[in-house]
A protein has these predicted regions:
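Pocket-forming structural segment of enzyme catalytic cores
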Residues: 105-127
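Flexible gly/pro-rich beta->alpha loop and the following alpha-helix that scaffold active-site loops
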Residues: 26-92
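Extreme N-terminal starter segment of soluble prokaryotic enzymes
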Residues: 6-11
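Conserved beta-strand scaffold positions in the cores of enzyme catalytic domains, especially
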Residues: 12, 35-37, 109
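Cofactor-binding loop segments of dinucleotide-utilizing enzymes, especially the Rossmann-like FAD-
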Residues: 13-15, 40, 96
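Catalytic nucleophile loop
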Residues: 84-108
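Short N-terminal binding/cap micro-motifs at the start of the first secondary-structure element
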Residues: 18-23
């Protein structure tokens, strides 16, 4: 679908301000998506808005899916993820979002031996 096609809606649930859709955002926009960001901990979208979006993305953050006692808003987000999965509408989970999807589908999600984040230094070589 090109940007000339009818506009579609992508809702992105963001857990920290500096973690957005990144390189996916221009790809989505080029395919006719209007992007709406929802800040975690702020009022979540209505169930209707969440289920009617053409695409939902749950982004990463510095917490884990098991941190619901410290971050109670994760419970609401997990409910939204479950509903979206049950609706069989497109849902993309990145990092924490993938944890939430796995948990909602009944998988055991647990911390690894070391913390990790999804970036690192890249150096050019002579090869």
């Amino acid at each position: 679908m090109s940007s000339r096609s009818a506009s579609r809606t992508c809702l992105a649930l963001r857990h920290v301000a500096f973690e957005d859709l990144g390189t996916l955002e221009p790809l989505f926009r080029d395919r006719g998506f209007r992007i709406g960001y929802i800040r975690a901990g702020a009022p979540c979208p209505s169930v209707r808005e969440w289920l009617e979006a053409d695409l939902c993305v749950v982004l990463g953050g510095p917490v884990g899916v098991g941190d619901t006692e410290s971050y109670p808003y994760l419970k609401t987000e997990l409910d939204l993820v479950r509903m979206r999965l049950e609706s069989r509408q497109p849902l993309l989970g990145v990092c924490l979002g993938a944890q939430m999807m796995a948990h909602a589908l009944g998988s055991r999600v647990y911390p690894g031996k070391a913390r990790e984040i999804g970036w690192g230094t890249v150096s050019l070589t002579g090869d």
